[in-house]
Amino acid sequence: DQVDKESQKRRPTNVTKVARAVKPRAANGIDQVVFYHEGVGTSGPLDSFTGGAFGSGIEANVRDLYRFIVYNYEPGDELYMFGFSRGAFTVRTLAGFMALVGLLEKDDDYYVPEIYACYESGDKPGSPAWLKAFHNIEGTRPCPPIRFLGVWDTVGSLGAPGMLGQIFNGKKYAYHDVEL
């Protein structure tokens, strides 16, 4: 999530409302885990400026979210990701990263920064940088199913996150509303 105007900080965003609406246990008895992250530009005036002007902090947020999934995902789980503005860019980037890398084992989380740097650099899997990053990793788990990716006002000036096409090859539904 991301809000950069002082007056809007007091009002919950759509992402906040969705996070608050999720019950800890679904009607069918399945546990539901919510991880809410306020996003870049929310911890003070300097953070607001650097996050707003340059997207500063997005990489760290992607890595934090990825680690949360590494530690909490169990086979059979489904992921629902939501984001607003730079938060939308963040969850789209996270989805692309997971599509390319899969999920590391918990014991390999130490390598997340190095692997993410390879992803961010645009190097292709199999390149020397990727081989070095994965040198001590025996393998990864497949990318978890992303059941829903809900984004509002994605920040386009930061570029399009890579690998999004691979995530949604088997999509059931896709909606895009450009009119308000």
Which residues make up each language-model segment?
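Alpha-helical segment proximal to the catalytic Tyr-Lys
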Residues: 1-180
